[in-house]
Amino acid sequence: RINTIIYIIPFAFLFCYNIVFSQTPSISKKEFYFMKGNIGGSAITMYLYIKGNRITGKYYYDSIKQFIDINGNINGDTFYINEFVNNNKIASLNGKVTENMFFSGDWISSDLNNKHYFNFSRYSSSSISKATIINSSLKIDLEGSGKFDSSRDAVVIENQIKSKVLDKISVDVDGVKSLDENGIADILSKEIIADYNNWKNNLSLETDINVKREIKISYLDDKIISFAINNYSFVGGVHGIDTSVAYIYSISTGNRIGIKLSELISNPSDMDLINLIRNKLLINYSEKDFFDFNAIELSDTFDITPTGIKFIYPVYKIAGYSLGIIEIEFTFSELKPFIKSNSPFFYLFE
């Protein structure tokens, strides 16, 4: 009997320890850099993310302004990056990187027929050239009783100049009332643990939950910064729901802008504009794909891109779930006739 007790107690302790340990969210950080440089003498603008030794992001030639996706690895002072257009690899960049984030090396086309020298570095002239995206996540499988999967991002803008405006943006964009990275991680983790405990206590109602919030910088210049916030929520039922919204801020005031369509468009009911959006929808879809094609108007959710304005239709807004989130982009020249002259975005169309 004594031996049995001796063996049971350590086993029970280990079991309880594993349960507690498994309920501790993991924390990770990803650094965002706003970069400028050139490839073969052609100016580029780059949104670069570094997480550990992993590089992701996108860039565009300033003369073309069409995003090119990138991913690769950094190892000490060397790096290798592949670039893609529509998921097709078109070139690679490899070379050296210094401690102050100056990248240089050779750009080589996939067919090996073209080779150019490149360099890019942090755009120090910008008020915002670096931000940290902090993530807290927790995944638990109760083995037959349900699965819990939650992940949340928050962002803090590097603020060496102690600008109240930049701090205002950092606090507002994710709703986390802290500027300290450890404090932010703690807040995110407490929110996730609270959700977990609520889920665990209601397993009879829902067996699985999957909730995610991802934040990316979708556009940045000297006047505005836009964050794309993508959410996914599954709390039972047939399927989960994706949402995408842009949080756009004035860098001079820290105020959020672009909340209403009236801040951008002079007359959202203009039939020329409405017909234009419907024609764009028909490029990839047919009229029967929508609930009521002739009732479709301009979405009041939009984001900025290097080439124009992207309008975002949430799931179920104009079509069924299978079509997902629908995004339609206008070039600046296409949309210019419909822009308010006093819009905070008017400078983009000049």
What does each model-identified segment do?
Residues 123-223, 313-318, 325-328, 332-350:
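Active-site acidic/histidine clusters and adjacent loop/turn architecture
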Residues 92-94, 261-328, 336-350:
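Short aromatic loop motif centered on NTY/YTY
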Residues 24-99, 104-107:
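Central antiparallel beta-sheet cores of small beta-barrel/beta-sandwich binding domains
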Residues 198-255, 259-264:
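Acidic/His-rich structured neighborhood in mature extracellular/periplasmic domains
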Residues 23-29, 62-78, 106-137, 242-251:
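Edge beta-strand at a domain terminus
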Residues 8-17:
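Bacterial N-terminal signal peptides
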Residues 1-9:
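Bacterial N-terminal signal peptides that target proteins for export
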Residues 18-22:
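Sec/Tat signal peptide C-region and signal peptidase I cleavage site
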